[in-house]
Amino acid sequence: MPDYRSKTSTHGRNMAGARGLWRATGMKDEDFGKPIIAVVNSFTQFVPGHVHLKDLGQLVAAEIQAAGGVAKEFNTIAVDDGIAMGHDGMLYSLPSRDLIADSVEYMVNAHCADAMVCISNCDKITPGMLMAAMRLNIPVVFVSGGPMEAGKVKFRGDEKAIDLVDAMVVAADDSYTDEEVAEFERSACPTCGSCSGMFTANSMNCLTEALGLSLPGNGSIVATHANRKKLFLKAGQLIVELAKRYYEQNDASILPRSIATKAAFKNAMTLDIAMGGSTNTVLHLLAAANEAEVDFTMDDIDELSRRVPVLSKVAPAKQDVHMEDVHRAGGIMAILGELDRANLLDVSVPTVHEKTLKDALDKWDIIRTEDPDVYEFYRSSPGGVPTQVAFSQNRYYSTLDGDREKGVIRNAEHAFSKDGGLAVLYGNIALDGCIVKTAGVDESILKFTGSARVFESQDAAVEAILGNEIKAGDVVIIRYEGPRGGPGMQEMLYPTSYLKSKGLGKDCALVTDGRFSGGSSGLSIGHVSPEAAEGGAIGLVEDGDTIEIDIPNRTIHLNIDDATLAHRRTVQEAKGWHPKEERKRKVSKALKVYAMHTTSAAKGAVRVL
């Protein structure tokens, strides 16, 4: 039976000094011997998804204390990708994921904590904490701050639901007046919480449900609703139970690596494909699997993408649907329930809250349960009042959305598409693969052939798009923006948004070794591997080359002969793999260290030492 890790610093004559310091934090005689639970918070006033988390760590801590544990809170950093977008700040976003993972490891191991509650929300924070949980392999429960309510704007006689991406698109569309743009800006983000669509933050918080590491509703109930408080209270109670089961009953089945097995990772990816989640989730699941020492690869993702249908379309894939609508339809447990009925899940896997995923679905899937409390939970609605306060409203929808033929969540028979919401493409321009969010691609351009317009940076591409230099039929190539080449693998939300602004969303493709925001849609192909900076063929594309994209057949092809490609490679290798044009970009020592150790997107952009 394993000893409590904290016993290292709380027991024995020689630990008198350490105990003296513990006492200075408020511990008493009776606390030594209880499990010490790290409450890993990520409050910051920089990020709307985290601005309301300040007091929630202590809310969880009080439940831990009441359940017989000792709670000790600390904070990680949190980068807001939307605010960091469009300038050199975005270079720091993906590297912050690894910094978060390291900071959690440092704090938990330095102080010998026994278990963790991870309070996350936005883009790189949930993945960073997930990587740390897999690395540390101690009992953990994830609970996120929750989605923002969708914005509402009265525009030209109609009220419509909007989000951050809408504000970005109209800002670059000359058909909108300054006053109209300002109204979109003021209305797009009305409350605290992670941006309201199926963007990266919400995608990852949904995937923690499928991995079995968070409670039902974690990914879908809005941040402002009083019922979300129940998740935080339950997390505090549950983590003490899990810690005692492991350390006092030798039950290793509740450890993260016992729960997040390869089957669980495949379940999570299946969910991601079915709900058209962010392409960033591919990076993050690969990275978490790497930390868990699970053999989960791009090949697994490719295989799943060929047989999992799209059961839900949420903004940006369907602009009038947001996370609050997914919750009303039964949330993630409802999507998992439909996947189970289609025999696309392994429901024998355990979770932190039920013995198996099957048990969880029997209890929480609104189609199979008759529990009125579950129905009420999923009727939790937005409040419609701008606020930065968590749990500040208690409004309910009058009914649930249980329509599985035409509703927000469909069954497999009535799927939005029989082909999955994400796809892995291979070809001579991407030997190790690249990713496209097919749920956001118009059917008319699933097969696309166009002429390359090559840019050595995101900034140059944006300038060309806004300068009306991009025409219908172009394939915009943005390279040297990968994990190593950026460095930091910037998101390309501005280029994709501006293509929409210019009316080119269905007439152009964008191909990059960088990545995309979860808010991106259109024929946006990212994570091209190998990246240009490590000798990838994307670095050999020239203006005017023909690029052939065939999503149904999972191919992307640079249409030049092998001899020409080989000649270009010889010439480029002599020059070195770096941008042909100098970029106005300050690369700090921290970013240089990241670039030295990072791997390609095909491996999750993890570090190799």
From Swiss-Prot:
Kindly list the cysteine pairs connected by disulfide bridges: none
What is the free-text note on the cofactor?
A: Binds 1 [2Fe-2S] cluster per subunit. This cluster acts as a Lewis acid cofactor.
Record carries keyword Membrane: no
Q: Name one GO biological process term.
A: isoleucine biosynthetic process
Q: What is its EC number?
A: 4.2.1.9
- Which is an annotated GO molecular function term of this record? dihydroxy-acid dehydratase activity
**Which residues bind [2Fe-2S] cluster per the record?**
122, 195
Q: Which cofactor does it need?
A: [2Fe-2S] cluster; Mg(2+)
Q: Which reaction does it catalyse?
A: (2R)-2,3-dihydroxy-3-methylbutanoate = 3-methyl-2-oxobutanoate + H2O; (2R,3R)-2,3-dihydroxy-3-methylpentanoate = (S)-3-methyl-2-oxopentanoate + H2O
* Quaternary state and interactors: Homodimer.
Q: What does this protein do?
A: Functions in the biosynthesis of branched-chain amino acids. Catalyzes the dehydration of (2R,3R)-2,3-dihydroxy-3-methylpentanoate (2,3-dihydroxy-3-methylvalerate) into 2-oxo-3-methylpentanoate (2-oxo-3-methylvalerate) and of (2R)-2,3-dihydroxy-3-methylbutanoate (2,3-dihydroxyisovalerate) into 2-oxo-3-methylbutanoate (2-oxoisovalerate), the penultimate precursor to L-isoleucine and L-valine, respectively.
User: Which named protein is this?
Assistant: Dihydroxy-acid dehydratase
Organism expressing this protein natively: Acinetobacter baumannii (strain AYE)
Q: Which gene encodes it?
A: ilvD
